[in-house]
A protein has these predicted regions:
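Glycine-rich, N-terminal phosphate-binding loop of Rossmann-like dinucleotide-binding domains
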Residues: 6
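C-terminal target-recognition/interaction regions appended to catalytic cores
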Residues: 158-292
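N-terminal Rossmann-like NAD(P) cofactor-binding module of classical short-chain dehydrogenase/reductase
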Residues: 1-3
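Class I S-adenosyl-L-methionine
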Residues: 9-194, 198-200
């Protein structure tokens, strides 16, 4: 299995003709070139597992995705793609990502790949993308990831100056029709917005309400940021969601430890994939494409 992620912006530079040569200068070209070399060497990857932002579907009016899919077809791969949301896989985060699963037609005789769209309360996989999907999946709350209140340093409570700045900026953006600004959540919120690599700067995309204590909002701690992506970072007062993944993988017993500075931890977690989504997708790849 060849896994990869790549930015879509470089496709805007050269213009598109929908083919392998047209991907030059992009990170996707490097992925495609590695695959081509493996094919030429007689050891083609059976499966390609690619991840990108949801916006890839509409980037350059869909031409970027068409070029990528045409390249996969040119290399001899059948494929399926769809957008999955982490909030349906047992983590309280609204994080949509586009996944492409491709299989080498000369080796893997599958006719299609069925995506998992969520995890049910009993741990089973949901394969139907229905309008009521949110009612069928494992329930979460933002407080599922919280560290004990008495263990959270005052460092994470934002300053008066920053809080006033967030509020003023949101007012201006709303008046200008931009719709951007801070997002405030509490312990009963079903899920948060998407955490990004820039979270370390001001935490504006996910702030935790502390008005009941007479305090300004706070940022997530690095541990909470990791848990939001599904990392099993153990702490006092927190339990790993039992049904987030019940497949009995050995990795379920692994505990993650943050060994980098706070800023780097935020950056890495913001750039990460949501672990439960990847684990469930990986299981489906094995069952549907590698075992047949």
């Amino acid at each position: 299995v060849c896994c990869g992620g790549f930015p879509c912006q470089p496709f805007s530079i050269a213009g598109l003709r929908r083919g392998f040569e047209d991907t030059r200068g992009t990170l996707f070209f490097n992925i495609a070139n590695i695959v081509k070399q493996k094919i030429d060497s007689g050891i083609p990857p059976k499966v390609l597992f690619l991840e990108n932002v949801k916006g890839l579907k509409t980037h350059m009016k869909g031409e970027t995705l068409k070029t990528i899919l045409a390249t996969l077809d040119e290399l001899g791969y059948a494929y399926n793609y769809d957008v999955l949301n982490a909030k349906y896989f047992g983590v309280p985060q609204n994080r949509e990502r586009l996944f492409i699963v491709a299989w080498y037609k000369d080796i893997v005789k599958a006719t299609t790949f069925k995506f998992p769209y969520g995890i049910a309360p009993d741990g089973s996989t949901i394969y139907e993308k229905s309008k009521d999907l949110g009612d069928k999946v494992i329930k979460t709350k933002v407080s599922d990831i919280f560290e004990p209140e008495d263990s959270i340093d005052s460092y994470y409570t934002i300053s008066d100056r920053l809080w006033i700045g967030h509020q003023e900026r949101k007012k201006r953006n709303k008046a200008n029709g931009k719709g951007f600004g801070y997002s405030l959540f509490n312990e009963n919120s079903v899920y948060s917005s998407t955490i990004s690599a820039r979270y370390w700067k001001d935490g504006s995309e996910i702030l935790i309400d502390q008005s009941d204590k007479g305090l300004n909002p706070r940022k997530l701690t690095p541990t909470e940021a990791g848990r939001l992506q599904g990392y099993r970072i153990i702490g006092n007062g927190w339990k790993y969601p039992e049904n987030a993944d019940n497949q009995n993988y050995n990795s379920d017993n692994l505990e993650f430890h943050i060994v980098v500075p706070r800023k780097e931890a935020y950056h890495q977690f913001g750039n990460s994939v949501a672990i439960p989504v990847i684990k469930r997708l990986s299981k489906e790849i094995v069952e549907q494409l590698l075992k047949i």
